[in-house]
């Protein structure tokens, strides 16, 4: 395929106006349209409701050509004659590209080659060797100039073109319209001989195999060469496909080219879906880290998801990298068994150990490890036998994140839930120390005393079952944090109301004895002498810290009764010195953050939009 390369000095763009008043003032309803040609650009003043056909008449009179030769392009779309400029969104200052066709109209190279026999404007070089390629020579153009303009090497731009006329767009159009050149390019034998002779063409075919199909198809080749004659349309198409690299045109808010027209567009779209699903899966364990009650399950349940044929254990390096506080909630669909590999508790060994459990599915296998204290036993074996709800040919894999999440969130089985809950209740009944530690986290003395006196009873098991189901919900922790925040504001704004809500404060560590009169507010303290020190993961300590924020300092009982202005006077001065002049906003931020200056600054910046 011949490669046409031309270089010419950049022509200065002449920009003059046509039909603009001398004073420069434009009446309403009149717009200025910039008409851009390959050589220059002109400003026309027309009415905004002008038809495209009427605008073509103005352009044809200016360029001295026929209306059928004009092609108007705006934002990558051809303007039709029956449309108006305002309907196509053309307003004052917009640019319209104009392409002027040749007078004889677009003709294919094959049609031009047929006329070559009758017109015979060139002679053929008949060599005795029987070479099938025909080299034509027209009047005023020798063979050397044709070859230099059509078969120029890639190094030619470094040297430059000798004559500015050769590099002009009009000259390129004339060369392509010449019958000798068209007959030369329509010769498929000549086209097939070009790649072996040109090294850069071979490299281009190796990098882009579609080029070889282009060389084999004569119709596509003719259409491509016909398109090369109109370089303005090619530039417009390239500007649409690369709007970020074109400073002249603003980004189009309504692109007309879909993602499927861009090379590898569907691949990028699919990769974005995969990344979104991965982020969604990675964010599921983060929702459970702040709940101290679900951490009880973290220390006992360790699930290893694998296929029935998987027998090779993971290396030690992969076990070390896995999270120690993560719970995998698997649905009953596709499960065959949940079997701990080490169900015998070891009460003598106090060293923390890893207890892997197996959850066999029909799909991809993943393994995770959870650090478990030695004195807390594992859950008993739970056998789940259920027919899968999908076909036999369907494979359920954790890699297909959207199917796994949909099945996990929407198709929970009552039988499996009851079996797991029953096993957990049985475990807590057999080990009251662990249940007491859980109640210890709740900071509740009444239930703690009731547990010591009535363990185990059927009533206690029923209450514990409901309690576990309620506390295992992540939204429960969020509700408790909201209650804690509201009580904190109430303690600072209206402490006189605290005795009236005494029955509702036991869950958050506020126990106001009935024998004490206001304002003697005494926070309840831990009282577990015969209990072992609780061992909970980091999320439990975070929840304890949050619950303890609501308690006033024990050294100064009247500290919570001070006015917020007096209590946070130093912090208020610090915020005002830093440039936060809104007194009420600073006070509310300090009340919400319990006097934490850094958190108050972050809250104020967030409210201001920074």
UniProtKB/Swiss-Prot annotation:
Residues 31-105 form the Ubiquitin-like domain. Pfam families: ubiquitin, UBQLN1. SUPFAM superfamilies: UBA-like, Ubiquitin-like. SMART domains: UBQ. Residues 562-607 form the UBA domain. PANTHER family: UBIQUILIN, UBIQUILIN-LIKE PROTEIN. This is Ubiquilin-like protein. The lineage of its organism: Eukaryota, Metazoa, Chordata, Craniata, Vertebrata.
């Amino acid at each position: 395929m011949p490669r046409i390369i031309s270089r010419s000095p950049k022509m200065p763009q002449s920009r003059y106006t046509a039909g603009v008043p001398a004073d420069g003032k434009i009446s309403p309803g009149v717009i200025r349209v910039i008409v851009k040609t390959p050589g220059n650009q002109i400003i026309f003043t027309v009415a905004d409701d002008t038809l495209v056909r009427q605008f073509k008449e103005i352009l044809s009179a200016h360029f001295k050509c026929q209306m059928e030769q004009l092609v108007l392009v705006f934002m990558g779309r051809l303007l039709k004659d029956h449309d108006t400029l305002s309907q196509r969104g053309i307003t004052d200052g917009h640019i319209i590209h104009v392409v002027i066709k040749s007078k004889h109209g677009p003709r294919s190279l094959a049609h031009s080659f047929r006329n070559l026999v009758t017109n015979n404007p060139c002679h053929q070089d008949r060599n005795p060797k029987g070479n099938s390629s025909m080299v034509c020579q027209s009047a005023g153009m020798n063979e050397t100039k044709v070859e230099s303009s059509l078969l120029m090497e890639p190094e030619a731009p470094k040297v430059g073109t000798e004559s500015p006329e050769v590099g002009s767009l009009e000259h390129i159009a004339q060369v392509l319209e010449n019958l000798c050149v068209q007959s030369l390019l329509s010769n498929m034998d000549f086209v097939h001989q070009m790649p072996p002779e040109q090294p850069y063409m071979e490299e281009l075919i190796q990098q882009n195999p579609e080029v070889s199909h282009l060389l084999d198809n004569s119709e596509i080749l003719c259409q491509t060469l016909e398109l090369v004659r109109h370089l303005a349309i090619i530039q417009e198409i390239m500007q649409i496909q690369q709007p970020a690299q074109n400073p002249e045109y603003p980004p189009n808010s309504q692109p007309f080219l879909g993602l499927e027209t861009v090379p590898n567009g569907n691949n990028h779209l699919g990769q974005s879906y995969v990344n979104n699903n991965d982020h969604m899966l990675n964010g599921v364990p983060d929702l459970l880290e702040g709940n101290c009650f679900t951490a009880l399950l973290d220390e006992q349940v360790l699930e290893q998801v694998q296929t029935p044929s998987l027998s090779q254990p993971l290396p030690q390096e992969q076990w070390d990298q896995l999270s120690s506080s993560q719970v995998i909630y698997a649905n009953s669909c596709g499960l065959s068994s949940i079997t701990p590999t080490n169900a015998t508790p070891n009460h003598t060994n106090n060293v923390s150990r890893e207890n892997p459990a197996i959850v066999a599915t029909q799909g991809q296998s993943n393994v995770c490890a959870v650090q478990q204290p030695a004195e807390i036993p594992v859950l008993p074996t739970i056998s789940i036998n259920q027919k899968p709800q999908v076909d036999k040919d369907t494979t359920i894999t954790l890699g297909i994140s959207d199917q796994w999440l949909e099945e996990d969130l929407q198709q929970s089985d009552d039988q499996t839930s009851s079996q797991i809950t029953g096993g957990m209740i049985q475990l807590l009944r057999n080990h009251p120390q662990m249940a007491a530690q859980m109640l210890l986290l709740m900071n509740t003395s009444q239930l703690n005393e009731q547990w010591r006196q009535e363990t185990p009873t059927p009533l206690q098991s029923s209450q514990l079952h409901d309690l576990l189901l309620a506390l295992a919900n992540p939204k429960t922790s969020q509700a408790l944090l909201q209650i804690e925040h509201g009580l904190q504001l109430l303690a600072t704004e209206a402490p006189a109301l605290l005795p009236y809500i005494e029955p509702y404060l036991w869950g958050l560590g506020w126990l106001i004895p009935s024998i004490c009169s206001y304002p003697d507010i005494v926070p309840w303290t831990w009282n577990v002498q015969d209990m072992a020190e609780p061992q909970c993961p980091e999320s439990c300590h975070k929840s304890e810290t949050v619950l303890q924020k609501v308690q006033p300092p024990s050294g100064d009982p009247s500290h919570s009764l001070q006015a917020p202005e007096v209590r946070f006077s130093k912090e208020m001065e610090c915020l005002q010195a830093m440039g936060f002049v809104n007194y009420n906003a600073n006070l509310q931020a300090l009340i919400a953050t319990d006097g934490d200056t850094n958190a108050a600054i972050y809250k104020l910046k967030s409210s201001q939009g920074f």
